[in-house]
Regions:
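Membrane-embedded alpha-helical hairpins and interfacial helices in multi-pass inner-membrane proteins
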Residues: 25-30, 38, 59-171
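Hydrophobic transmembrane alpha-helices
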Residues: 1-51, 55
Length: 171
């Protein structure tokens, strides 16, 4: 791995972590709007962003846990897995477009995080499987993700695309 690529990974990780920590409690828990998730849009443009964003999620969840913002130890692992799977699927489905935008790819993090984190929260807060609790958490997580990846993602689509093109040129 070249020094430029390592630098790029470090920058993406740092931006993701900083956005999570600056937003504090809004980035953690069942009712969250994790603004850093807008960076997931970068996965549409280049698969090289998947691992840095996964690492950023891992570190943000770990630091959140250590700071008392994130109360689930398992979220450090499952949240990171959800980010990794979302990034892969976003990249794989990037060619499916609606009105010249990758809307399906932008919705994927909401679905994946809603399922994985919804199950995690439902199991943590109840004894056994509770479908209605899972559905509640799924909706909470899904809506927060959609606000970040779809609505904010559409607003920042062009700048993020330009950043990705610049990075592809330079790195």
């Amino acid at each position: 791995m070249k020094i430029k690529e390592i630098t790029l990974v470090g920058i993406i990780v740092a931006i993701y972590v900083c956005l999570c920590l600056v937003m504090g409690n809004f980035s953690y828990g069942p009712l969250q709007i994790r603004i850093a998730e807008v960076l997931m849009i970068l996965c549409i443009f280049d698969s090289r962003f998947i691992l840095p964003l996964t690492l950023g999620c891992f570190l943000a969840n770990l630091l959140g846990l250590l700071m008392g913002l994130n109360y689930l130890t398992l979220d450090v692992i499952f949240g990171s897995v959800a980010t990794f799977v979302s990034g892969i699927l976003m990249y794989r489905f990037r060619n499916i477009k609606f009105r010249n935008r990758e809307i399906l790819s932008m919705i994927i993090p909401g679905i994946i995080n809603g399922i994985i984190i919804g199950i995690e929260l439902a199991l943590y807060t109840s004894n056994g499987v509770n479908i209605s609790l899972f559905m509640t958490y799924f909706v909470y997580i899904f809506v927060g993700e959609i606000l970040s990846t779809l609505f904010l993602g559409l607003l920042l689509y062009k700048p993020l695309q330009d950043i990705s093109l610049y990075i592809n040129e330079k790195f």
